[in-house]
């Protein structure tokens, strides 16, 4: 089987078919405690946005609002120009836990919710994630990375226009994690869906995203466009500068946002940076 890295390098991005998102002045409360307030964010169809921030800052809460798993307490959320509310058939969420059914074989896990006549579609998507030969096996026989591939196939078999990723790779070893990042990026380029990723890993955010958004204490503190060419090389000086600048901003709340802008100025393909709390782009 051809390596993911080789396949990834050869892919060209298709025309986006993803969901457009617009969040304005969003507020979320639990009792009297506000966990999100003043969130303003727009995500273009087919855009890949990564959300970073410390634990408890509100990243996953925002993801649940976008997914329709929880209601918004103030402001508005629109999908493709229409007010969003509740679960949508064209959106799927992938979690850190693959949540496979142990009593169903791999192909049956991918085909959950599909008519029996669509099993060929499930087999096709399983092949896209590199596991066609494991279709008849039980989930218990798979590695952690393979289980996440099955979970990804189960999400993509429904042909979502919006894929929400809530720390899906956090429990994987470093090499498997990079392999999965390449797979996700390649499928995103090929299929054109909108992707929103919540992650604690700044390197992962820089590797995958068109934009990296930092949330601090329920507010957007940084929105940085990543204009590095794809596929991205972690050892490249421009990549390292961006990763370090964003990580410093995450870890040192009073750090100067201009540090991120300065790092961006060294990238070979210059373009304007958007670093503000008003021009937001959020993600899982």
Curated annotation (Swiss-Prot):
One of its GO terms (cellular component) is plasma membrane. It comes from the Bacteria. Its EC number is 7.6.2.14. It is found in: Cell inner membrane. It is an enzyme of class 7 (translocase). Residues 21-242 form the ABC transporter domain. CDD domains: ABC_NrtD_SsuB_transporters. Signal peptide: none annotated. Its main location: membrane. Keywords: ATP-binding, Cell inner membrane, Cell membrane, Membrane, Nucleotide-binding, Translocase, Transport. One of its GO terms (molecular function) is ATP hydrolysis activity. It is a peripheral membrane protein. SUPFAM superfamilies: P-loop containing nucleoside triphosphate hydrolases (SSF52540). ATP binds at residues 53-60. The complex is composed of two ATP-binding proteins (SsuB), two transmembrane proteins (SsuC) and a solute-binding protein (SsuA). Belongs to the ABC transporter superfamily. Aliphatic sulfonates importer (TC 3.A.1.17.2) family. Part of the ABC transporter complex SsuABC involved in aliphatic sulfonates import. Responsible for energy coupling to the transport system. This is Aliphatic sulfonates import ATP-binding protein SsuB. It comes from Ralstonia nicotianae (strain ATCC BAA-1114 / GMI1000). The lineage of its organism: Bacteria, Pseudomonadati, Pseudomonadota, Betaproteobacteria, Burkholderiales.
């Amino acid at each position: 089987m051809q390596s993911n890295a080789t396949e990834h390098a050869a892919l060209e991005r298709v025309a986006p078919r993803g969901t457009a998102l617009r969040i304005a002045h969003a507020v979320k409360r639990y009792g009297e405690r506000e966990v999100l307030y003043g969130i303003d964010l727009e995500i273009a169809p087919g855009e890949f946005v990564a959300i970073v921030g410390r634990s408890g800052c509100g990243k996953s809460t925002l993801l649940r609002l976008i997914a329709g798993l929880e209601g918004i307490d103030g402001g508005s959320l629109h999908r493709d120009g229409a007010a969003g509310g509740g679960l949508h058939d064209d959106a799927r969420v992938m979690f850190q836990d693959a949540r496979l059914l142990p009593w169903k074989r791999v192909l049956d896990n991918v085909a959950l919710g599909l008519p029996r006549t669509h099993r060929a579609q499930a087999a096709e998507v399983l092949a896209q994630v590199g596991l066609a030969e494991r279709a008849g096996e039980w989930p218990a026989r798979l590695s952690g990375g393979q289980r996440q591939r099955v979970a990804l196939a189960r999400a993509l078999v429904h042909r979502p226009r919006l894929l929400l990723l809530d720390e899906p790779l956090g429990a994987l070893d470093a090499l498997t994690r990079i392999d999965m990042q390449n797979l996700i990026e390649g499928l995103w380029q090929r299929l054109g869906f909108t992707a929103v990723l919540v992650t604690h890993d700044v390197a992962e955010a820089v590797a995958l995203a068109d934009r990296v958004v930092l949330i601090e204490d329920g507010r957007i503190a940084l929105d940085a466009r990543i204009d590095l060419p794809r596929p991205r090389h972690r050892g490249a000086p421009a990549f390292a500068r961006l990763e370090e600048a964003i990580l410093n901003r995450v870890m040192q709340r009073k750090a100067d946002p201009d540090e991120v802008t300065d790092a961006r100025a060294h990238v070979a393909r210059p373009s304007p940076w958007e670093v503000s709390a008003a021009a937001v782009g959020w993600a899982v």
